[in-house]
A protein has these predicted regions:
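N-terminal Rossmann NAD(P)H-binding glycine-rich loop of SDR-like oxidoreductase domains
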Residues: 3-23
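SDR active-site strand-loop-helix element
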Residues: 7, 51-55, 91-97, 143-145
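Active-site segment of SDR-like NAD(P)-dependent oxidoreductases
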Residues: 58, 97-100, 104, 113, ...
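Active-site helix of classical SDR
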Residues: 122
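NAD(P)H-binding glycine-rich loop region in Rossmannoid oxidoreductase-like domains
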Residues: 40-85, 99-102
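Conserved Rossmann-fold NAD(P)-dependent oxidoreductase catalytic core, especially the SDR/UDP-sugar
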Residues: 78-118, 133, 141
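Adenosine-cofactor binding site in Rossmann-like domains, unifying the SAM/SAH pocket
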Residues: 28-43
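NAD(P)-dependent short-chain dehydrogenase/reductase
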Residues: 139-142, 146-176
């Protein structure tokens, strides 16, 4: 049985992942942890095979830029370092497509990151800090999802969905 620890216990992705595992009876033991409480540092990570790091500050207009770096970069690297030090073999970092900036065209493996927001910049810096920890005993996977949506999702999707139903205008997109 794989043992997984999810950071960001209240995240939409984390809750949805847990529901999926439970619904399909997949043989994983999943725990969650809230990194807002400094007691997380006392948690024994050695019992886990994988950490899925979802904890983040996303697009909050009222936040100072420094909080993005404190949470999205510094905390992420600290969690990854603790995981490595305690023998976790897999670390999955959820980053963001925002690392590419807002005005990019088609994104492929040659696309260079060029973040424009504190959110995107802090996530890219987290990627760079965490990838340095990778070795033969500690595998790092970095995912850069676009907008996350689904039933009961938070964020902009519901607003965009409602707007698209009111305005009958769709841009022509050459989707490759």
């Amino acid at each position: 049985m794989k043992r997984i620890l999810i950071t960001g216990k209240n995240s939409y992705i984390g809750r949805t992942f847990i529901d999926w595992v439970e619904e399909d009876n997949i043989d994983y033991e999943i725990d969650t942890i809230d990194l807002k409480n400094p007691d997380w540092k006392k948690q024994d990570f050695s019992r886990y095979d994988c950490i899925i790091h979802l904890a983040a500050i996303v697009h909050k207009k009222d936040q100072e830029d420094a909080i993005y770096y404190k949470v999205n970069r510094d905390l992420a690297v600290e969690v990854a370092q603790k995981a490595k030090n305690e023998g976790v073999t897999q670390f999955i970092l959820f980053s963001t497509m925002s690392v590419y900036g807002m005005n990019q065209g088609i994104i492929n493996k040659e696309t260079k990151p060029l973040p424009k927001t504190p959110y995107g910049k802090s996530k890219l810096e987290a990627e760079k800090g965490i990838i340095k920890l990778q070795d033969e005993n500690f595998c790092v996977s970095i995912l850069r999802p676009p907008m996350i949506y689904g039933p009961n999702a938070t964020g902009n999707y519901n607003r965009l969905s409602k707007l698209s139903k009111k305005i009958n205008v769709f841009t022509k997109i050459n989707n490759q």
